[in-house]
Amino acid sequence: MSYVPIVIEQTSRGERAYDIYSRLLKERIIFVCSTVEDHMANLVVAQLLFLEAENPKKDIYMYINSPGGVVTAGLAIYDTMQYIKPKVATLCIGQACSMGSLLLCGGEKGMRYSLPHSRIMIHQPSGGYRGQATDIEIHAQETLKIKRLLNELYSKHTGQELKHIEKSMERDNFMSPEEAKKFGIIDNIISSRDAMTMSAK
């Protein structure tokens, strides 16, 4: 288990200790910095809902450094981002691959960012199934449905034609921030917090 730093906050009432992620949550910053799976997705969804309840008019900032993961877990986060009232700004730090790239481009239009040396990757969903032939066929059909759904979502958020999305996602498609901006996954490449603040205005 990795160590999570504890930070001390000085207030008029004394000192209070937070783990680093809880302290940043107070600043409306959410981290998606691991493989996307059900447990972490539930935590991210809960944080999004909490921040909406706290202030439905104030922006949320989602920092993404993820290799991707389970499609349904990623869609739970994506749907919640679209569902809540606050605008969700997304920022790629390191990598946003597979479902991580969908979350990146699913942020508020004009508020989707990447740091200069991040990597973004899109591809079609994969599945490995074992069992009876009928069950394998059922799962294969479901994978194709998910593939079509993801293609439609990428098309919606990037502005690319569906046929171009389908072709681009046929294999692992790695992009630099410049390429991701041209593709429509992000809106701006930033190297400082000031640049992020200025581009959001």
From Swiss-Prot:
It catalyses: Hydrolysis of proteins to small peptides in the presence of ATP and magnesium. alpha-casein is the usual test substrate. In the absence of ATP, only oligopeptides shorter than five residues are hydrolyzed (such as succinyl-Leu-Tyr-|-NHMec, and Leu-Tyr-Leu-|-Tyr-Trp, in which cleavage of the -Tyr-|-Leu- and -Tyr-|-Trp bonds also occurs). It is found in: Cytoplasm. InterPro entries: ClpP, ClpP/crotonase-like_dom_sf, ClpP/TepA, ClpP_His_AS, ClpP_Ser_AS. Gene3D superfamilies: 2-enoyl-CoA Hydratase, Chain A, domain 1. The active site is at S98, H123. SUPFAM superfamilies: ClpP/crotonase. Its EC number is 3.4.21.92. It comes from Rickettsia felis (strain ATCC VR-1525 / URRWXCal2). Its main location: cytoplasm. This is ATP-dependent Clp protease proteolytic subunit.
